[in-house]
């Protein structure tokens, strides 16, 4: 809904900040919603920036609930939710995802500022007291806080919420602050180690971004996923949506899908002779970042090759 945010997290992949401007007015957002309904996705996530910064947020939320009959998720930092508005928000909502980035006041405040942790935890307890239980709390993981994952999971267990662990992505404001999250030994591949400790978790499949999911930015431009909002990967603008676009997407008859195929490690020249390339870095957004950063590529390659060769052989 917006690229404005009242917080300024140093990892933000879309560089949201309070001084950003909203690009779509209320009528344009409603038109976008009408076109999303035509696409008929299973789930619609309302996000930002911080969506509650929009003065017309509740008008838009009401319109979404009226028009869209699938699962509606609100993604928010929860700092602007007033207790008096909770009933209105949770009515007909499928889930709320709240970014928290910590298991206590100190760990949270390092990213989100003082007082956010207590405010969010109290709000979560209040929402749950209303009988709404489908709440997820998210944490972006980097070298500074990887040891906090167990404590974060324990917090979620105590609250009865779902932990959402997100990998740090070296894009947006995160690109400016990558040294705080990455180093030679703990690069963007390190967090994947837990996924590769069992052969059964290995996969050679690329994700289905652009087909199973799409991301719409604050201008209405549509991309394969939130981490691939680059000009060369723009699919179309939601305000200009036509039914024929769906046929083009499902037939993969768009230039963006050719570029997508080039984000497979098996198609990268320096990866072609690697014996574990089909299992390495199957996330297109990670590959996109690695291709354009030689130092990060080499660091990730060394780390992942060591992990994968150990597991496979």
Name the predicted role of every residue range:
Residues 1-27:
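Canonical Radical SAM [4Fe-4S] cluster-binding loop centered on the CxxxCxxC motif
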Residues 1-11, 41-46, 52, 213-216, ...:
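N-terminal pre-triad scaffold of radical SAM enzymes
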Residues 11, 15-18, 174, 183, ...:
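Secreted/processed peptides and extracellular or luminal domains of membrane proteins
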Residues 23-50, 54-167:
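Radical SAM/AdoMet-radical enzyme domain recognition
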Residues 130-132, 170-202, 227-281:
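C-terminal accessory region of radical SAM enzymes
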Residues 207-211:
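Short, small/polar residue-rich loop motifs at catalytic or cofactor-binding pockets
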Residues 233, 263-313:
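Radical SAM enzyme core and accessory elements
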């Amino acid at each position: 809904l917006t690229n404005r945010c009242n917080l300024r997290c140093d990892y933000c992949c879309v560089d949201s900040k309070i001084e950003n401007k909203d690009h779509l007015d209320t009528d344009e957002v409603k038109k976008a919603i009408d076109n999303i309904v035509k696409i008929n996705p299973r789930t619609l996530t309302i996000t930002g920036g911080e969506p509650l910064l929009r003065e017309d947020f509740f008008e838009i939320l009401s319109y979404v609930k009226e028009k869209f009959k699938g699962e509606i998720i609100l993604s928010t930092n929860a700092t602007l939710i007033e207790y008096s508005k909770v009933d209105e928000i949770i009515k007909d909502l499928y889930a709320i995802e709240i970014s928290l980035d910590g298991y206590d006041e100190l760990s949270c405040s390092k990213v989100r500022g003082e007082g956010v942790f207590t405010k969010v935890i109290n709000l979560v307890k209040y929402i749950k007291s209303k009988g709404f239980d489908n709440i997820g709390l998210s944490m972006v993981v980097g070298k500074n806080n990887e040891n906090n994952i167990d404590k974060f999971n324990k917090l979620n267990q105590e609250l009865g919420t779902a932990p959402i662990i997100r990998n740090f992505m070296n894009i947006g404001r995160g690109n400016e602050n990558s040294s705080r999250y990455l180093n030679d030994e703990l690069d963007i591949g390190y967090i994947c180690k837990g996924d590769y400790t069992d052969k059964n978790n290995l996969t050679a499949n690329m994700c289905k971004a652009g087909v199973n999911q799409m991301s719409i930015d604050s201008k209405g431009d549509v991309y394969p996923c939130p981490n691939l909002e680059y000009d060369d990967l723009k699919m179309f603008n939601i305000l200009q949506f036509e039914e024929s676009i769906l046929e083009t997407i499902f037939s993969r008859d768009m230039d963006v899908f050719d570029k997508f195929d080039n984000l497979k490690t098996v198609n990268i020249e320096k990866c072609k002779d690697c014996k574990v390339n089909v299992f390495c870095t199957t996330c297109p957004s990670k590959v996109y970042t690695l291709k354009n950063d030689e130092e990060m590529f080499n660091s990730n390659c060394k780390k992942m090759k060591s992990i994968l060769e150990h597991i496979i052989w």
